[in-house]
Structures are given as structure tokens and as C-alpha cells.
Amino acid sequence: MPSADGSSSARPNGTSSRSDQLAWYKSQYEQLEAELADFQASSRELEAELEKDIEASEKRERLLKEKVDSLKYEVEEWKVRLEFTTFIADDGPRANLSLPRQTKYKQSKAEGNSAQNTLQKEITTLRDANRTLQLKLRDIEVANDDYERQARHTTSSLEDLESKYNVAIERAVLLEEEMRAGEQEREKLRIENQRLRDELSDLKIETEIIHEKLRNAELQNSRRRKPISLRSPSTPQTPDLFNRSPASSIVSSPLFSTPTLKTSLMSATATPPSPPISESSSSLRKSMNAMPGFPLQKASASDSSFGSRSLHGSRTQKHNNHSRATSYAFTSNRPTPSVTNRPGLPKPKPKPNENTNKHNNNARSSGLPKSGSLYQIRGLIGKMQKLEERVQSAKSKLPPPSDSPSRTSSRSGSILGESPVASTITARRNSRKRLSGSSFSSSVRDGDSVPSYAPHSRPSFGARTQGDSRPSSRTSYSSHSSVSHSTHPSVTPSTRPESRQSRTKTPLGHYSTNPTTESRRPRSSLSNPSNQNGVVNGMAHIDEDEDLAMHMSLRARISEIRETRLPSISTPTGLKKRTPSGISGIPAPRTLRTSTGFDRLEGDMGPPERKSNITDLGETY
């Protein structure tokens, strides 16, 4: 193929050099080689395209062959059908020719019909199953709705029951609270009722005792009308009367073994009863008028009545407005329960007024009546026995004793043969516990010990120093009070030591017997030294605190009477004595706990006339 370049396209001639020829041939060779490569590439592409076309044509050919075959089969079938139809329509010798084709057609038709019937049956069965399942599903849904409705009803009923249950619980709690409050109120009412019954019974017994004492006093006043002559100052003292040394004053207690009735009668014979209070007070006035140096007292006949709160009117206490010391004046020479003295607290010296001077002048105007008759002693013993019978009959009417242990009181007054009734006891009730006790106080003058009683729940000792000139109580030692006054005319009066009527408190019942706690004891309820004006007559001037303490003391008397039901208990020996500071030789009260569980205080001191141990008369604890 000629080149576009003229120099190269021109074939070199023989005159041209070999290099030119060689270059021309090389260019020709390269050109032909490039054309060959292009041709080969184009031929390869063409070959690939042709192969693709061949494959596509072959595929089309196969499809067409299949179509041809199917069409041939259809043609054959149509031919058979056509022949069959023609055979049916035309009877002739041609039927024999189409018999094989007819058999094949029937066979295929039978197969088709059987398959169609089977499919129709399956369809019918499936439809029935579907309908049945739909019905079941509907029934299940209905049942599910019923269950849901029932569950809702059950839930609502449970909620209602829970609400009702909560309401019932709240109501039950409220009812329990109301029942508890009702029980507490009923218990309070029962306690109040029992307390009122006890107070009523106490008041009845106290009234009976006071009436009996009043009758005894009237009888003794009617019997003792002849006064005895006063003792002159030069008359020597009776050694038994003024022998009040600590050796002769023996502490007795209800815990010691009670002597027989014979011993009590002997003690009553040895200690004759004192004259009536009115006569002894008149003799005391006379003796005091005869002694100008003796301290004056507030005294009257009504002072010594059984409800008197003041036996020593000259010893007033300006600071004591609520006295609680119980004091009953008896009709014989029995030591009177008086206010106990505390040696540590001095009291202001009272100023005698015109009333005290007047009463003391009246006290000096009469003498002591005669006392010592065996007839009077026997009469007193008979009255004492009657009173004991009345106390026993009153005990049978009392309710049973409480469960809490109570403290008994010492009854040292009944050994002297005058009144069988023991000292009144001031009891403090703490809740349901009824606590009672007795206190002992001893007044010492010139080394002598004089027993006196104060109805407290703890014992204490009041000391009398050398200058203390308090005379003996008109109700306790009325037989020799004027003698002691006339024998000691030069005794200077001094202030009375601090007694239990000071503002001190006491532990209730059996909580403490420590002497350090005895100074906190409150006063008794009835005995009040007249610290405000004039003479206290009977129980007319008892204030509210004293009324309350009086009721407590009356209830304590019931406790004391109940304690008499217990068997007698002997006291163990070898007990230590407790002596307060500043006092020597005075028997101190001792606290003993017996096997019955009752805490008792012994501080009873025997009368100065006797040297032997003195215990209660006919009373066992």
C-alpha cells in the first residue's frame, strides 16, 4: 500500500544506496505489521460478536424447535379430536382406523376427570375445615370475652372486698381503741368505786371508834369527879414515874412476840389510867399558875377531844401551813401520838399571848383526880375487849387486802390498859398500793427518854436537850404532868426542835427506810400544833390537805386492821440500833423485813413505869 509521503512511497531504484532501501523496506514492514495487528484486533472483535450472534441464534432455534414440537403435539391432538369427532359423526370403516387414538384420548380424559374430582373433594374438605375452624375461633372469642368479663367482675369484687376489709380493719382498730379506753375508764371507775368504798368503810370504822372513845370519855368523866390534890414542889419524885433512862425505855414493835392477856392485865394494873382530859387540863392549869417560870401552853377542854389537832399549843410553827401529823388524844394515861421532833432543825420560839396565859391560868386552877382503882381498870379492860370485838366484826365486813405489801403500825398504846385502839396511821396511796406505817419519836429531857408516837410511815427521833422544857402531854402523862411541873419550876423554856410538821417530804410506803430520806417525809393529817391563833377545838379547822390526809389515815387504819389477820411473827434478836447525830442512848427505830413480805418499823418504847419489854395487847401481826 503506497505511503502518503512521496519519498517513502517511491520505491528506491538501483542507484539508491542500500541504507535507503533498507529503510524503505523497514518502513514497509512496520506499516504492514501495524495493519496486521489492527486487522487481528478487529477480527477478534468480530469473531466475538459473531459467536454471540451464533449463540443467540442457537437459543432461538431451540425455542423454536420446542414450539414446533408443542405445536406438533397440539396438532396431533387436534387431529385426534377431529378424527374422533368425525368418527362419532360418521360411522363407517374409518372407525377402525382411529381406535388407538380414541383409547389414548379416553385415558387422558379419565385421568383429568379423576384429578379434577380429587381436587374438588380436597377443596370441599378444606372449605369445611375452614368453616369449622372459623366457628371454633368464634366460639373461642366468645368464651374469651366471657372470661375477660368474669375476670373484670372478679377484679372489681376483689377491690370491693379489699376496701371493705380495710374499712373493717380500721373499724376493728377503732373499736379496740374504744374498748381499751372503755376498759381504762372502767378500771378507773372501779378503782374510784373501791376507793370510795374503802373511804366509806374507813369513815364508818373511824366514826365507831370515835363514838366509842367519846362514850368512854363520858363514862370516865362521870366516874372521876373527885380531883386529887396537887403535888407540892417539895414532894419527892416517884422513881418509876420519872425514870426515863434509855435503859428503862425498851423499844417494842409489833414484830416482837405478843404477850398473853395476863401480861397485859399486869401492865394495866401497874399503870393506872389517867383522869379525864378536862380534869387533867384543869389540874395542869392550876399547876402552871403555881409555877411562874414554866412555859405557858394553850389548853382547853376541847383541845383534848378525840379530833384535836394540837396538843401543845405553845409550840407554834410559823412556817408550817399544811400540817399532816395525826394526833388523837385518848382518855387514859396512854402516850399520845404526837408530832415527832427532828433534832437538826430548830424552830422559832413562840410568843405566849393572852389566850395562852388565860388557858394556863385555868389549867392551874384544878388538881388531878384520883386514878388507880381496880374497878376502873377492869371497866377499861371490858371496854377494850368490846372494842376489839367491834374491830373484829368490822374486819369481817372489809374487802380482802390488796396484793401490794403494806406496812403495819406499832400499837404500843394498848399495853397500858386504857384504849384498845392503836395510834392513827397516815397512809399514802400510790396508785393501787395502800401503804401504812408508824413513826416513832422520842423526846429526851435531862437524859430521860419519853416515848411519844407520831403516825408516819417512817420512824424518826426528836431530841430534847437540857434546856428543852416541853411538858408532857396532858393526854399521855396527865397523872403526873403537874408533878413534873411543880418539881421542876426552874426549867427555862426553849424552842421546840424541828418536828415532822416542817416542810419535809417522805418516801411513800416501803420505798425507803434510809435515815437520809426520812427528812423528806410530809406531815401527818390531823395533829397540827396551833401555829395560827388560839386553840384548835376538835377537827373544825382542818384544811384541804388535812382532809385529804385524814382520808388517807382512815384508809390506813383499815390496812392496820387487816394486818391483824396475819399470824404473830417473832422478831429476830441481835438487831443493830441506829442513833441519830446529836443523840446518845436513845433506841433508834429498826426496820425489819419478815417472811410475810411486810416491811415494819419498830420504834415503840415502853412506858416509863415498866422495866420489861412491852408489846401489844391481844394483837398479832
UniProtKB/Swiss-Prot annotation:
GO terms for cellular component: cytoplasm; kinesin complex; kinetochore; microtubule. Residues 18-219 form a coiled coil. This is Nuclear distribution protein nudE homolog 1. PANTHER family: NUCLEAR DISTRIBUTION PROTEIN NUDE HOMOLOG, NUCLEAR DISTRIBUTION PROTEIN NUDE HOMOLOG 1. GO terms for molecular function: microtubule binding. Pfam families: NUDE_C. Keywords: Coiled coil, Cytoplasm, Cytoskeleton, Microtubule, Transport. It comes from the Eukaryota. Residues 1-20, 231-263, 323-341 have a biased composition (Polar residues). It is found in: Cytoplasm, Cytoskeleton. Residues 599-613 have a biased composition (Basic and acidic residues). Residues 264-288, 300-310, 353-362, 404-414, 469-496 have a biased composition (Low complexity). InterPro entries: NUDE (IPR033494), NUDE_dom (IPR006964). Self-associates. Interacts with nudF. Required for nuclear migration within hyphae during vegetative growth. Residues 1-21, 218-372, 389-537, 569-621 are annotated as: Disordered.
